């Protein structure tokens, strides 16, 4: 029988620390059964004196060996809600796990989230080791006290009260040492790193880690090894379970579940529940208890109205409306205003800006890095998306997490431009403002994006930018989804709230012209702008809420102005409007092929490629195309789903091109083509020779006396007889090939080779 406890919290302006947040649910010492002392000690050292509702509801159930399905708002403390039960279940085992046995498995959708969970586990395991050292020291001290007591008893009777106190102290020490069933450690198993699957297996074999944390693909590969024993597995955790399914890991999860024992505890943790997730619950869990933690208003206006929210009470959700051509300028002004002391938040130090595509992140990061007004305010920019190499992605993420404000005042804010790769589960500390330049194509991602701020009781603001018109219906849609949005003003160039000008915003137009100037002098900016615009339009056409975000009602010319394009790309979405005369855009009257790269190395490569393409034959041009394909493969090795499937079409095509470059084509197509060309040239030479011979014969016939009819008749008879003999010979040869044995076949082949050689020597019949 499953239950659905719902913990309510009040919405008020609470303090900025978890220990005094308005949504606390009691002290850790009130949990039943009680937690291990070193776990409570570390929580106290970290300043987490109070539990959050999701922790208070989940930990007792999970530790009591019940399967749980936990749905809670972002930033509510779900990580500790499963890390602590995992540690408790392993620490309370009666026997210690062997080196090749796995005790717990934690699956996450991305490398960054897996690394974050791993760091939390390492922190607790270090506390365990420290507590074990203290227990050993206490045991040694007790043994010394016991020896002293025995020596004292040999001289005189012992005081009864002192003896009782010593025995109690010894029992306490024995209690600490009795749990020396220590957890061996944790291991991180993710793709995109220098470690290969074989390295993962060797590390597990050598270290004997009890807990595995990683992404589905690499975990499945490791668990499939014969040397890894899963029979002793105690607990399985699927963090951000709905995201695991969205990224296409369904089959990986099914195979992982098939490798694990049935008698285990399983926990699913997510901020949203889906139908696909319900199917996974049916397959992988046994009589689960569902825990749903909601945020509700302190005073309900009516008993018939559901005032519960899907976002934290300390989060302020806002929306801004503007025309498409003013959107880029508004983004710059929002960053400047929210990081200034005049903002409601008192000056944001960290902001996150979400875009739909990787190409947009690359383009706007490059452009905003050169915008003078942001540089004057010393705004630090970072870019993060799924097509970056794993090393660059990790470096950028770590740098942003570690970044701090330069000075107090209206300067020094850190801004991360990213895609949804940073929308789920990641604990980005001290993020004050989230800006969604593009609403997510999947509406379920909206709350996850907003949840990067207002975490653990902190205040935060989330702003979504919408185009004036049909997109305004998105506000009503989110209200139905229990995520109310409040209006955010249109900002002027002086960062004051005003009504959007009916005509062009002069300051926004100046920003557009300045970015156009960058594109006219740097081909990299020009190409990035085209790719970003195309990717944005394509993403817009695939929006799940197409009844709100309609491509036919999108102002494509206004969007092009927001991207500061100096020319429109050639794409079907534009051609139909251009032919109908509904799309008018002022392109720059320049020769686009003459725009150089500002990077001298890239410009030299481009010039060499242009000169080479004009001189080299088609085969060389094809080779350069193959080189370009290789470059594209190198640039796109990494993607949002962290474990690339080895049998995907992209991987097969990439491997085929690599094989062709290294060893040539796998088939004999090139050899057959060369043979056909040689035969074609041979036949052409033969035709030329025959024509020459025919011309000479006709010339000689004019000067020779005519032969009589009898000679002509004899020649015709001889020719017909020769043709008949050839036909009969071919029939005999065919019969011989069908009926002869191997020896005859070999003899025939040698004769045929000799005949073929003679035929090559005398290609035509001479009378």
From Swiss-Prot:
Binding sites annotated in the UniProt record for ATP: 72-79
Cell location: Nucleus, Nucleolus
Bias type Polar residues, positions: 690-700
Domain Helicase ATP-binding: 59-291
Extent of motif Q motif: 28-56
Region (Disordered): 132-176, 609-767
Domain Helicase C-terminal positions: 330-507
GO CC list: nucleolus
Gene3D superfamilies for the chain: P-loop containing nucleotide triphosphate hydrolases
SUPFAM superfamilies named among the record's database cross-references: P-loop containing nucleoside triphosphate hydrolases (SSF52540)
Any one Gene Ontology molecular-function term assigned to this protein's record: ATP binding
Biased composition (Low complexity): 749-761
A biological process from GO: rRNA processing
Compositional bias annotation for Acidic residues: 140-160
Main subcellular location of this protein, as a coarse class: nucleus
Recorded catalytic activity of this chain's protein: ATP + H2O = ADP + phosphate + H(+)
Entry comment, domain topic: The Q motif is unique to and characteristic of the DEAD box family of RNA helicases and controls ATP binding and hydrolysis.
Name recorded for this polypeptide: ATP-dependent rRNA helicase SPB4
Organism of origin: Mycosarcoma maydis
